[in-house]
Amino acid sequence: MKSILEQLSSITVVVADTGDLDAIKKFQPRDATTNPSLILAAAKNPDYIKLIDQALESSRKSLPAGFSESELIKETIDQVSVFFGKEILNLISGRVSTEVDARLSFDTEATVTKARKLINHYKSFGINKERILIKIASTWEGIKAAEILEKEGIKCNLTLLFNFCQAVACANAKITLISPFVGRILDWHKAKTGKDNFAGCEDPGVISVTKIYNYFKEKGFKTEVMGASFRNIDEIKELAGCDLLTIAPKFLDELNREEGELIKKLDEDTQSQSSIDYKFDEKDFRLSMLEDQMASEKLSEGITGFSKAIEELEELLLKRLSEINNQKLISTT
């Protein structure tokens, strides 16, 4: 009998949520997603030290004479993300998501500028922008930035998405793909209610993604829905049939080892028509987020967490730069 993973792959695009190249080789997904935390974890792996060194050297060459150490590290942050993305694209047939610096989440102009720069880095390697999804936090400013980028033909993946308002705002902006989170919503409800068991369709994260998916299909939105941030494989199975699901290697492994019948839970062909067309301007969006304690807290927490990961990656790069400079000094004495 086919594994649950094989069955899932026949009805949903399975995406690897990792920067670990070995895991991507093992599971051979169509697409892959990365974020600052995943890039940091991969960068800490001694197996990828050569890639880090290549990114540092490439950054040196791309900067004008007289650049500062801080300018070099800032440039290398972008290069590291692209170098990992390039290596991932060598292993998959589809797209990779590369995230804009989370510290720009409330700056539309800076986000647009950074996204264009990332795309140009990929272009320098001969990689078509059709294979790249620029990952941006689902703030109002992030959605507006993505709307600008989409009009330029730069496809975006709006992440840290925790409620219906964020999703609809993205769809109305004609964003290519959204990543509504599942597990982090579950975490919040567990902490607030003290209830530990939200089984199957009672899982609040599953309910959120299901609502978004059904509404998008009812209204004919082209924005793809990719469930993300899972805490167990039951959440994944409850969303079988979703456009895409991005899954961590440990859960891909579990799904690959499990057998049994997988039931398709989401189906775009069986949706009833809703009479309500939701629209959110900036005022409505901000009010909706303010009224949704879970979404507000989790969005803030996510941006803070990704920002800290970038800062830690900067420290790692500084340490490696110092090691390289010391090696060069020793070799010349």
From Swiss-Prot:
Its EC number is 2.2.1.2. Pathway: Carbohydrate degradation; pentose phosphate pathway; D-glyceraldehyde 3-phosphate and beta-D-fructose 6-phosphate from D-ribose 5-phosphate and D-xylulose 5-phosphate (non-oxidative stage): step 2/3. Signal peptide: none annotated. It comes from Prochlorococcus marinus subsp. pastoris (strain CCMP1986 / NIES-2087 / MED4). The active site is at 135 (schiff-base intermediate with substrate). GO terms for molecular function: transaldolase activity. This is Transaldolase. GO terms for biological process: carbohydrate metabolic process; pentose-phosphate shunt. Transaldolase is important for the balance of metabolites in the pentose-phosphate pathway. The keyword Cytoplasm applies. Homodimer. The keyword Transferase applies. SUPFAM superfamilies: Aldolase. It is found in: Cytoplasm. Belongs to the transaldolase family. Type 1 subfamily. Keywords: Cytoplasm, Pentose shunt, Schiff base, Transferase. NCBIfam families: talAB. GO terms for cellular component: cytoplasm. It catalyses: D-sedoheptulose 7-phosphate + D-glyceraldehyde 3-phosphate = D-erythrose 4-phosphate + beta-D-fructose 6-phosphate.
